Protein backbone atom coordinates (compact mmCIF):
# COMPACT_ATOMS: atom_id res chain seq x y z
CA UNK A 1 0.00 0.00 0.00
CA UNK A 2 1.63 3.24 -1.11
CA UNK A 3 0.21 6.50 0.22
CA UNK A 4 1.83 9.55 -1.34
CA UNK A 5 0.90 13.11 -2.31
CA UNK A 6 -0.06 13.90 -5.88
CA UNK A 7 2.90 14.56 -8.15
CA UNK A 8 5.45 12.37 -6.34
CA UNK A 9 6.04 9.94 -9.21
CA UNK A 10 3.69 7.09 -8.32
CA UNK A 11 3.40 5.95 -11.95
CA UNK A 12 7.17 5.49 -12.22
CA UNK A 13 7.19 3.74 -8.85
CA UNK A 14 5.01 0.92 -10.14
CA UNK A 15 5.77 1.25 -13.85
CA UNK A 16 9.51 0.59 -13.72
CA UNK A 17 9.24 -2.66 -11.69
CA UNK A 18 6.37 -3.82 -13.90
CA UNK A 19 8.45 -3.38 -17.04
CA UNK A 20 11.38 -5.21 -15.44
CA UNK A 21 9.18 -8.24 -14.75
CA UNK A 22 7.53 -8.49 -18.19
CA UNK A 23 8.17 -11.81 -19.91
CA UNK A 24 8.48 -10.79 -23.56
CA UNK A 25 8.04 -14.39 -24.73
CA UNK A 26 4.68 -14.75 -22.95
CA UNK A 27 1.77 -13.52 -25.07
CA UNK A 28 -0.70 -13.52 -22.18
CA UNK A 29 -1.74 -10.53 -20.04
CA UNK A 30 0.79 -10.47 -17.20
CA UNK A 31 0.29 -7.08 -15.57
CA UNK A 32 -2.83 -5.01 -15.01
CA UNK A 33 -3.32 -1.40 -13.94
CA UNK A 34 -6.78 -0.15 -12.96
CA UNK A 35 -7.47 3.60 -12.96
CA UNK A 36 -10.67 5.48 -12.10
CA UNK A 37 -10.96 7.57 -15.28
CA UNK A 38 -10.35 7.51 -19.00
CA UNK A 39 -7.94 10.42 -18.83
CA UNK A 40 -5.82 8.86 -16.11
CA UNK A 41 -5.75 5.55 -18.00
CA UNK A 42 -4.43 7.31 -21.09
CA UNK A 43 -1.84 9.23 -19.05
CA UNK A 44 -0.59 6.06 -17.37
CA UNK A 45 -0.38 4.32 -20.75
CA UNK A 46 1.63 7.20 -22.21
CA UNK A 47 4.04 7.16 -19.26
CA UNK A 48 4.49 3.39 -19.43
CA UNK A 49 5.16 3.55 -23.17
CA UNK A 50 7.73 6.28 -22.57
CA UNK A 51 9.44 4.15 -19.92
CA UNK A 52 9.34 1.13 -22.25
CA UNK A 53 10.74 2.84 -25.33
CA UNK A 54 14.08 1.04 -24.95
CA UNK A 55 12.47 -2.37 -24.34
CA UNK A 56 11.52 -3.75 -27.76
CA UNK A 57 8.62 -6.16 -27.72
CA UNK A 58 6.62 -4.66 -24.84
CA UNK A 59 2.97 -4.27 -25.83
CA UNK A 60 0.62 -2.11 -23.76
CA UNK A 61 -3.15 -1.87 -24.28
CA UNK A 62 -5.45 0.82 -22.87
CA UNK A 63 -9.13 -0.02 -22.33
CA UNK A 64 -11.64 2.68 -21.37
CA UNK A 65 -15.22 3.68 -21.98
CA UNK A 66 -16.16 6.15 -24.70
CA UNK A 67 -13.92 4.58 -27.35
CA UNK A 68 -15.27 2.09 -29.92
CA UNK A 69 -14.83 -1.38 -28.46
CA UNK A 70 -13.70 -2.74 -31.84
CA UNK A 71 -10.50 -0.68 -31.64
CA UNK A 72 -9.76 -2.14 -28.23
CA UNK A 73 -10.45 -5.68 -29.44
CA UNK A 74 -7.80 -5.06 -32.10
CA UNK A 75 -5.35 -4.05 -29.36
CA UNK A 76 -6.12 -7.21 -27.40
CA UNK A 77 -5.56 -9.38 -30.48
CA UNK A 78 -1.97 -8.09 -30.50
CA UNK A 79 -1.41 -9.98 -27.23
CA UNK A 80 -0.41 -7.14 -24.86
CA UNK A 81 1.59 -8.09 -21.78
CA UNK A 82 0.38 -5.00 -19.90
CA UNK A 83 -3.20 -3.71 -19.78
CA UNK A 84 -4.27 -0.34 -18.36
CA UNK A 85 -8.03 -0.02 -17.94
CA UNK A 86 -11.00 1.55 -16.24
CA UNK A 87 -13.04 -1.00 -14.25
CA UNK A 88 -16.27 -0.75 -16.26
CA UNK A 89 -14.73 -1.23 -19.69
CA UNK A 90 -12.45 -4.03 -18.49
CA UNK A 91 -15.45 -5.93 -17.11
CA UNK A 92 -17.19 -5.44 -20.45
CA UNK A 93 -14.27 -7.09 -22.25
CA UNK A 94 -14.15 -9.87 -19.66
CA UNK A 95 -17.86 -10.58 -20.09
CA UNK A 96 -17.42 -10.70 -23.87
CA UNK A 97 -14.56 -13.15 -23.54
CA UNK A 98 -12.05 -10.72 -25.06
CA UNK A 99 -9.56 -10.94 -22.20
CA UNK A 100 -8.50 -13.38 -19.50
CA UNK A 101 -6.74 -12.41 -16.29
CA UNK A 102 -5.68 -15.85 -15.09
CA UNK A 103 -2.04 -15.17 -16.02
CA UNK A 104 -1.77 -11.80 -14.23
CA UNK A 105 1.07 -11.75 -11.69
CA UNK A 106 0.99 -8.02 -10.87
CA UNK A 107 -2.09 -5.85 -10.38
CA UNK A 108 -2.07 -2.16 -9.51
CA UNK A 109 -4.97 -0.02 -8.34
CA UNK A 110 -3.92 3.56 -9.09
CA UNK A 111 -5.76 6.40 -7.33
CA UNK A 112 -7.47 3.66 -5.33
CA UNK A 113 -9.24 6.13 -3.06
CA UNK A 114 -10.90 7.96 -5.96
CA UNK A 115 -11.77 4.74 -7.75
CA UNK A 116 -13.55 3.29 -4.74
CA UNK A 117 -15.19 6.61 -3.85
CA UNK A 118 -16.69 6.64 -7.35
CA UNK A 119 -18.62 3.46 -6.60
CA UNK A 120 -16.37 0.92 -8.32
CA UNK A 121 -16.03 -1.33 -5.26
CA UNK A 122 -18.05 -4.23 -6.75
CA UNK A 123 -16.38 -3.93 -10.16
CA UNK A 124 -12.90 -3.83 -8.65
CA UNK A 125 -13.72 -6.82 -6.46
CA UNK A 126 -14.88 -8.87 -9.48
CA UNK A 127 -11.72 -8.01 -11.38
CA UNK A 128 -9.41 -8.86 -8.47
CA UNK A 129 -11.16 -12.21 -8.02
CA UNK A 130 -10.58 -13.01 -11.72
CA UNK A 131 -6.81 -12.88 -11.13
CA UNK A 132 -4.74 -15.65 -9.51
CA UNK A 133 -4.63 -15.67 -5.71
CA UNK A 134 -0.82 -15.61 -5.74
CA UNK A 135 -0.61 -12.42 -7.80
CA UNK A 136 0.79 -9.25 -6.24
CA UNK A 137 -1.80 -6.55 -5.56
CA UNK A 138 -0.49 -3.01 -5.13
CA UNK A 139 -2.60 -0.05 -4.02
CA UNK A 140 -1.45 3.47 -4.86
CA UNK A 141 -3.39 6.36 -3.38
CA UNK A 142 -3.09 9.98 -2.35
CA UNK A 143 -5.25 9.35 0.71
CA UNK A 144 -6.60 6.30 2.51
CA UNK A 145 -10.15 5.43 3.52
CA UNK A 146 -12.19 2.50 4.79
CA UNK A 147 -12.84 1.06 1.32
CA UNK A 148 -9.12 1.05 0.51
CA UNK A 149 -8.29 -0.70 3.77
CA UNK A 150 -11.10 -3.25 3.23
CA UNK A 151 -9.66 -4.20 -0.18
CA UNK A 152 -6.21 -4.44 1.38
CA UNK A 153 -7.40 -6.62 4.25
CA UNK A 154 -9.36 -8.96 1.97
CA UNK A 155 -7.02 -9.37 -0.99
CA UNK A 156 -3.48 -8.55 0.11
CA UNK A 157 -1.21 -10.90 2.02
CA UNK A 158 0.88 -9.28 4.73
CA UNK A 159 0.90 -5.92 2.95
CA UNK A 160 3.68 -3.43 3.52
CA UNK A 161 2.47 0.14 3.92
CA UNK A 162 4.72 2.83 2.45
CA UNK A 163 3.71 6.35 3.39
CA UNK A 164 5.40 9.33 1.78
CA UNK A 165 4.37 12.28 3.97
CA UNK A 166 3.85 15.70 2.50
CA UNK A 167 7.08 17.60 3.12
CA UNK A 168 8.39 20.97 2.08
CA UNK A 169 10.10 19.23 -0.83
CA UNK A 170 7.11 17.32 -2.23
CA UNK A 171 4.14 19.33 -0.95
CA UNK A 172 2.51 21.30 -3.77
CA UNK A 173 3.32 25.01 -3.50
CA UNK A 174 -0.24 26.31 -3.40
CA UNK A 175 -1.39 29.51 -1.73
CA UNK A 176 -5.07 29.25 -0.81
CA UNK A 177 -7.36 32.28 -0.71
CA UNK A 178 -10.97 32.55 0.38
CA UNK A 179 -13.08 35.46 -0.88
CA UNK A 180 -16.19 36.67 0.91
CA UNK A 181 -18.98 37.14 -1.61
CA UNK A 182 -22.74 37.07 -2.05
CA UNK A 183 -24.64 34.71 -4.31
CA UNK A 184 -25.83 37.54 -6.56
CA UNK A 185 -22.27 38.90 -6.93
CA UNK A 186 -20.46 35.60 -7.45
CA UNK A 187 -20.35 35.84 -11.25
CA UNK A 188 -19.00 39.39 -11.31
CA UNK A 189 -16.38 38.44 -8.73
CA UNK A 190 -15.37 35.52 -10.94
CA UNK A 191 -14.94 37.95 -13.83
CA UNK A 192 -12.80 40.17 -11.61
CA UNK A 193 -10.39 37.29 -11.02
CA UNK A 194 -10.34 36.37 -14.71
CA UNK A 195 -9.82 40.00 -15.76
CA UNK A 196 -6.75 40.37 -13.55
CA UNK A 197 -4.60 38.94 -16.39
CA UNK A 198 -2.28 37.48 -13.75
CA UNK A 199 -3.15 33.85 -14.54
CA UNK A 200 -2.86 32.47 -18.06
CA UNK A 201 -4.36 29.03 -17.40
CA UNK A 202 -7.26 28.65 -14.99
CA UNK A 203 -9.61 25.87 -13.86
CA UNK A 204 -13.04 26.78 -12.50
CA UNK A 205 -14.93 24.16 -10.49
CA UNK A 206 -18.71 24.02 -10.18
CA UNK A 207 -20.92 21.35 -8.66
CA UNK A 208 -23.35 20.41 -11.43
CA UNK A 209 -23.19 19.54 -15.11
CA UNK A 210 -25.97 22.02 -15.89
CA UNK A 211 -24.15 24.86 -14.13
CA UNK A 212 -20.92 23.97 -15.92
CA UNK A 213 -22.60 24.35 -19.31
CA UNK A 214 -24.51 27.52 -18.42
CA UNK A 215 -21.53 29.27 -16.84
CA UNK A 216 -19.29 28.25 -19.74
CA UNK A 217 -21.73 29.63 -22.32
CA UNK A 218 -22.09 32.84 -20.33
CA UNK A 219 -18.32 33.31 -20.32
CA UNK A 220 -18.02 32.45 -24.02
CA UNK A 221 -20.80 34.90 -24.91
CA UNK A 222 -18.91 37.56 -22.93
CA UNK A 223 -15.80 36.91 -25.02
CA UNK A 224 -13.77 34.84 -22.56
CA UNK A 225 -11.59 31.99 -23.94
CA UNK A 226 -13.42 29.23 -22.06
CA UNK A 227 -14.55 25.65 -22.56
CA UNK A 228 -15.91 22.95 -20.30
CA UNK A 229 -15.97 19.26 -19.41
CA UNK A 230 -19.15 17.50 -18.35
CA UNK A 231 -20.37 13.94 -18.00
CA UNK A 232 -22.48 13.81 -21.18
CA UNK A 233 -19.57 14.51 -23.52
CA UNK A 234 -18.24 11.83 -25.85
CA UNK A 235 -14.70 10.71 -25.11
CA UNK A 236 -13.49 12.15 -28.41
CA UNK A 237 -14.95 15.55 -27.48
CA UNK A 238 -13.32 15.39 -24.03
CA UNK A 239 -9.99 14.57 -25.65
CA UNK A 240 -10.37 17.50 -28.05
CA UNK A 241 -11.12 19.90 -25.17
CA UNK A 242 -8.14 18.70 -23.12
CA UNK A 243 -5.78 18.80 -26.10
CA UNK A 244 -6.84 22.37 -26.88
CA UNK A 245 -6.44 23.34 -23.20
CA UNK A 246 -2.94 21.89 -23.01
CA UNK A 247 -1.96 23.67 -26.24
CA UNK A 248 -3.22 26.99 -24.88
CA UNK A 249 -6.02 27.43 -27.43
CA UNK A 250 -8.23 28.58 -24.55
CA UNK A 251 -7.32 29.59 -21.00
CA UNK A 252 -10.35 28.85 -18.81
CA UNK A 253 -11.55 25.28 -18.23
CA UNK A 254 -14.79 24.72 -16.31
CA UNK A 255 -15.53 21.29 -14.85
CA UNK A 256 -17.33 19.31 -12.20
CA UNK A 257 -15.41 17.10 -9.79
CA UNK A 258 -16.41 13.92 -11.62
CA UNK A 259 -15.59 15.28 -15.10
CA UNK A 260 -12.19 16.56 -13.96
CA UNK A 261 -10.98 13.33 -12.35
CA UNK A 262 -7.74 12.15 -13.86
CA UNK A 263 -6.87 15.46 -15.53
CA UNK A 264 -3.15 16.09 -15.35
CA UNK A 265 -1.93 19.45 -16.68
CA UNK A 266 1.33 20.70 -15.20
CA UNK A 267 0.93 24.44 -15.74
CA UNK A 268 -2.50 25.32 -14.36
CA UNK A 269 -1.74 28.58 -12.58
CA UNK A 270 -4.96 29.06 -10.62
CA UNK A 271 -7.98 27.07 -9.46
CA UNK A 272 -11.24 28.84 -8.67
CA UNK A 273 -13.91 27.16 -6.56
CA UNK A 274 -17.02 28.82 -7.95
CA UNK A 275 -19.05 26.38 -5.88
CA UNK A 276 -17.90 24.77 -2.66
CA UNK A 277 -17.34 21.00 -3.13
CA UNK A 278 -19.74 18.57 -1.49
CA UNK A 279 -16.95 16.33 -0.18
CA UNK A 280 -13.90 17.37 1.83
CA UNK A 281 -11.56 15.25 -0.31
CA UNK A 282 -12.79 16.98 -3.47
CA UNK A 283 -11.38 20.26 -2.19
CA UNK A 284 -7.90 18.74 -2.04
CA UNK A 285 -8.29 17.15 -5.45
CA UNK A 286 -9.42 20.50 -6.89
CA UNK A 287 -6.63 22.67 -5.58
CA UNK A 288 -4.17 19.90 -6.42
CA UNK A 289 -4.69 20.70 -10.12
CA UNK A 290 -2.37 23.67 -9.63
CA UNK A 291 1.08 23.85 -8.05
CA UNK A 292 2.25 20.78 -9.97
CA UNK A 293 5.77 19.91 -11.13
CA UNK A 294 7.21 22.09 -8.33
CA UNK A 295 5.54 25.22 -9.73
CA UNK A 296 3.69 27.66 -7.50
CA UNK A 297 -0.08 27.75 -7.76
CA UNK A 298 -2.99 29.58 -6.20
CA UNK A 299 -6.58 28.68 -5.40
CA UNK A 300 -9.54 30.97 -4.79
CA UNK A 301 -12.76 29.93 -3.09
CA UNK A 302 -15.78 32.20 -3.60
CA UNK A 303 -17.54 31.76 -0.27
CA UNK A 304 -21.07 32.90 0.56
CA UNK A 305 -22.34 33.26 4.12
CA UNK A 306 -24.51 30.15 3.89
CA UNK A 307 -21.44 28.04 3.06
CA UNK A 308 -19.32 29.03 6.05
CA UNK A 309 -20.21 26.00 8.19
CA UNK A 310 -19.45 23.66 5.28
CA UNK A 311 -16.15 25.45 4.64
CA UNK A 312 -15.17 25.18 8.31
CA UNK A 313 -15.53 21.40 7.99
CA UNK A 314 -13.24 21.43 4.95
CA UNK A 315 -10.63 23.52 6.78
CA UNK A 316 -10.69 21.10 9.69
CA UNK A 317 -10.15 18.24 7.25
CA UNK A 318 -7.24 19.83 5.37
CA UNK A 319 -5.72 21.35 8.52
CA UNK A 320 -4.97 24.61 6.76
CA UNK A 321 -6.22 28.17 6.88
CA UNK A 322 -6.59 30.05 3.57
CA UNK A 323 -5.73 33.73 3.34
CA UNK A 324 -8.95 35.77 3.64
CA UNK A 325 -9.80 38.38 0.98
CA UNK A 326 -12.82 40.59 0.41
CA UNK A 327 -14.17 43.18 -1.98
CA UNK A 328 -14.11 46.78 -0.83
CA UNK A 329 -16.98 49.23 -1.26
CA UNK A 330 -15.23 50.37 -4.45
CA UNK A 331 -15.36 46.82 -5.82
CA UNK A 332 -11.62 46.18 -5.43
CA UNK A 333 -10.31 42.89 -4.07
CA UNK A 334 -8.36 43.68 -0.92
CA UNK A 335 -6.51 41.92 1.89
CA UNK A 336 -7.56 42.06 5.54
CA UNK A 337 -5.40 45.19 5.85
CA UNK A 338 -7.32 46.87 3.06
CA UNK A 339 -4.44 46.67 0.57
CA UNK A 340 -5.37 45.98 -3.09
CA UNK A 341 -4.65 42.30 -3.68
CA UNK A 342 -3.42 42.26 -7.26
CA UNK A 343 -1.28 45.38 -6.88
CA UNK A 344 0.81 43.50 -4.32
CA UNK A 345 1.54 40.57 -6.63
Where are these regions (language model features)?
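Conserved helicase RecA-like core
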Residues: 1-345
